Amino acid sequence: MAKKLRVGILFGGRSGEHEVSLLSAASVLKAIDRKKFDVVPIGITKQGHWLAPGDAHSLLAGDTSAVARRLRAGDPEATPGAKLLHEGIPTLMVPEPANGESAAKAALSPASPAMLDVVFPVLHGTFGEDGTIQGLFELAGIPYVGSGVLGSSAGMDKDVMKRLFAQAGLPIVKHVTILRSEWEKSPKKAIAQIEKVLKYPVFVKPANLGSSVGISKAHDRKTLGPALDEAAKYDRKLVIEQGVGGELRKGKLGPKARELEVAVLGNDDPKASVVGEIIPGKEFYDYEAKYLSEGSVPIIPAKLTRAESKQIREMAVAAFRACDLAGLARVDFLMEPSGKRRIYINEVNTLPGFTQISMYPKLWEATGVPYTELITRLIEFALERDCEKKRNSYSRDDK
């Protein structure tokens, strides 16, 4: 019988998406194939402390739909794993690549004398999917699920991401990028710069954040200022995008853009899932609509023509390659609600949610890849990518 791989599951983190990460980790720990993998859950507190919980099963306590209700009520202990992050054993990852071994491993100290064979970072947002923790894995010489340092950082920064999309010939909405310092120094000048390029409504976003945290929709100059202030709480760089549909006319909102999503899986030969659609329960698919509201409705597969579906799936793979991604990504699109029904690529998410209501696993399940198999494939792609990296020479003396 083949020896089981020891998989480190990282969750939590210094991020506005900390709670979402705990929910995702609970789902992954419940579904991972225990016949193939030994699991070491590793929590990261909001302050950045690494903890190795003693009892992984505690992470699964509670039903995630109940968790969502408790989160809405502001319960700080609502999420699975919250208790573990108070009771875990302080730990760290030793950046010491293995020498002469068939597989790179990383040690956890002092929580476990054993080595990890691979890491699955179930981390969302800053310090989780922005390339920082991926750099630590590279230093430690350990295989990990997901994109590398470059792809992760590019996939996190909406400004850089859009530049890569444009260079690859992918259609994007008009946008303006300003710095927080520019907005604070000269608000009138910043607003004039935005209004020169874009028409209302516009979406204002922190450049480096996910799960729609800090995003607002502005219908006019009066609402633009507060939207910029909100985004500026989270990042030094602000991205303002042209809205697609949803114009405010005579006090009424026009038809909204269709919000479409595709899950991509693989390394050098990535595959795209069926196309899904989200019907938000609110004006747009914000943080509350994604994780706390029961009003949003996923439609899988989306109601599209065969040609539209083919185009969107091809664009998803092209975006994956343009950002040099690996392992997994969810690619989001906007489609005009009427007229020419033009399709725009919105963004990529390099570590999409794995909660019970997350689209990434749902899209693959609809494509024929069950959740447990999906996790196994992601770990296999991490090992495949590590083998490919081992072919690289890092000095002239390497043999």
Enumerate the predicted regions with their spans.
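Hydrophobic beta-strand scaffold residues
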Residues: V39, P143-Y144, I172, V202, ...
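ATP-dependent carboxylate activation and anion-phosphoryl transfer catalytic cores
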Residues: A2-L5, F11-S15, R34, G169, ...
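Active-site nucleotide/adenylate-binding loops and adjacent lid/helix of ATP-dependent enzymes
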Residues: A2-L10, S15-G16, L22-L23, S109-A114, ...
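ATP-binding N-terminal substructure of ATP-dependent carboxylate-amine bond-forming enzymes
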Residues: M1-L150, A154-M156, V160, Q167, ...
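Phosphate-binding site of ATP-dependent enzymes
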Residues: S216-E314, P337-Y344
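Solvent-exposed alpha-helix faces
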Residues: A26-S27, D229, V317
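A glycine- and small-aliphatic-rich helix-loop capping segment at beta-alpha/alpha-beta transitions
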Residues: G135-Y144, D220, G225, A366-T367
